[in-house]
From Swiss-Prot:
Family matches, as Pfam families: Peptidase_C6 (PF00851), Peptidase_S30 (PF01577), Potyvirid-P3 (PF13608)
Motif (Involved in virions binding and aphid transmission): 592-594
Site (described: Cleavage): 284-285, 740-741
Native source organism of the sequence: Potato virus Y (strain O) (PVY)
One biological process term in Gene Ontology: proteolysis
Protein name stated in the entry: Genome polyprotein
Amino acid sequence: MATYMSTICFGSFECKLPYSPASCGHIVKEREVPASVDPFADLETQLSARLRKQEYATVRVLKNGTFTYRYKTDAQIMRIQKKLERKDREEYHFQMAAPSIVSKITIAGGDPPSKSEPQAPRGIIHTTPKVRKVKTRPIIKLTEGQMNHLIKQVKQIMSEKRGSVHLISKKTTHVQYKEILGATRAAVRTAHMMGLRRRVDFRCDTWTVGLLQRLARTDKWSNQVRTIHVRRGDSGVILNTKSLKGHFGRSSGDLFIVRGSHEGKLYDARSRVTQSVLNSMIQFSNADNFWKGLDGNWARMRYPSDHTCVAGLPVADCGRVAALTRHSILPCYKITCPTCAQQYASLPVSDLFKLLHKHARDGLNRLGADKDRFIHVNKFLMALEHLTEPVDLNLELFNEIFKSIGEKQQAPFKNLNVLNNFFLKGKENTAHEWQVAQLSLLELARFQKNRTDNIKKGDISFFRNKLSARANWNLYLSCDNQLDKNANFLWGQREYHAKRFFSNFFDEIDPAKGYSAYEIRKHPNGTRKLSIGNLVVPLDLAEFRQKMKGDYRKQPGVSRKCTSSKDGNYVYPCCCTTLDDGSAIESTFYPPTKKHLVIGNSGDQKFVDLPKGDSEMLYIAKQGYCYINVFLAMLINISEEDAKDFTKKVRDMCVPKLGTWPTMMDLATTCAQMRIFYPDVHDAELPRILVDHDTQTCHVVDSFGSQTTGYHILKASSVSQLILFANDELESDIKHYRVGGVPNACPELGSTISPFREGGVIMSESAALKLLLKGIFRPRVMRQLLLDEPYLLILSILSPGILMAMYNNGIFELAVRLWINEKQSIAMIASLLSALALRVSAAETLVAQRIIIDAA
């Protein structure tokens, strides 16, 4: 065993000791190495599908700046993988291909880039270069003294004229000088003055506070003000804190901006208040009282609406238009000023009309471009301007009439004096005075009629009434705006409204019956043959010429029956036409046309395409309603806006009075009535009117012409000439002739007899009920039904089920909306039926409750 020496030191002494290390045995043992475990293996397995999608995803940026993945779909990923595999496969085949020698490299087969090219000469620019000089404007800078002087001058000027100053920092502060608390003081616009309720009513920065301190120092800035004197309308006024006496809250900057009071304590608008104080605070704004009065009475005083109101107009624009309307009707400088109200009330009626007329015209000018949005305000102002337009009263004429007959009180001078006084008052006449004036005019008409004697002059043998060879100029058929590219007349909206004529007064021609079934037109004392059969044109020329001859019917010669006279003078438009020798012009064969309206009796006739009906079939007027073609011709001169009202008036006002087989006088009278409503029809051309003296009938020629010939021809070619028949003083046999066919073919629309009988003009009662049931679940059918036959609504009372179904589908509300401005009676019927439906629903509920109670 080996011996070793060990050295031990004790201070400076060194001691060496021998020692032998013990031998140790070595045991060899294999160490167990723990198996490595990947902690993310399971996670990678779970996220493999997501990582696979993220591998092919792209990055996009949202509107808020967030970066997100835009993942591909499985189909897109499959296509990308196939593309990569194809690329790797092509690269592998390229690498494994046999070597090849490259002898030449080109770019698309062109010259190499190193080849030099000649330099092309550049073009010469024949322009003068523009030298733009930037002008530097000096920045205006004011010293502190100059700025203070400017603020002082602005304050003095604005306080004298009670103007306003805008302080623009981060926010704009509006300073207004007003007469408040016995002095001109500065006031700011707080939040509650603009309709906003906030805990802090007014906010401003330090710079704004400094300017407010200088702008608020007006003449009586140091005068003492008590809080009990501050009242409504003083919101926003800036007071001196040092001069303010009473119970008030905290403030800063020696400024107190009035907001309101709570439990007798005055609060600064810059102070933050609690929510409970805010809810119960009395704010000193005039707007509060105004809006309180408006909101409290608006809902109570408004009228019921036939629709669901929505907020479709901007509130600010509504407020501006409300102010415009207020100044147009009740002009004043301040709405709270009693002096303005007294001055308005003390105006004479004539001066008030002039004032309203001027302000209504100014209101229309101020409305400007907003008239398309506020169409109701525009229409009101136009009506107000028209109704208040001053009348130019000629006092000299009044005095002259009064000097002549003023002292005479017997008829007819009494009636003339009444009219003279009526015209002097102008638009100040009351409804009773209008009625008295009309009665006076009636008495004058009767007096003149009784006084006038018809004097017979001349001999009928000298009567001549030639028909002009020139056609009348029709402006409405010559206007380019109403013609298409083929120069055909465009009906526009009139075509839709003309269906009221076709559905009630025309029959569809059934091709199965043939044209021969419609050739004979019956009239009270005979028949007339139409040329509708000639629509089938024979190819044989001789046969065609034979059909062109017509069926001649001999008429008596020219006599008193052919003439119309007044005061002994002939009224030529109301007479039959003659030749140069005095014999009557006899009608010839009039060929038929398809779907045309034929107008004009002088020169060449005009063919206008008929409006389209409900089908493509031909239409022919019902027996006895030939005169409907006159109103259809008048529709050409009616504007598209008035077409609906015109057709309804003809259907509901004219036709019920005329019925079938009306006299020429009655037809002319209804035309005169329509001319008052629609002045444009005065020059409307009429279809040719044939006179049959044997049967005392006037025939209105339609598009199917006339096979019967030999009739006399009436000269009247326009509505204004036809209206001449509507005169009791006119001596004429023709005005008593009948126009139309048999009277029992079509009942009058205004008759009290039920129109649902079999063979009636509309339909049977069962057919009408079926149509009503069909329209309940078809809105388009129901809307058309309400427009054409609104009184079918009454049939809903036959069944509670029908009544409830119509109510649940809103049909009664639709009827009210359609007729509220057209015919109040129909709207009232719809409202009553709606109320009845509610009662039926309540009754059914009560019956169900009774059954449940009895069963219990």
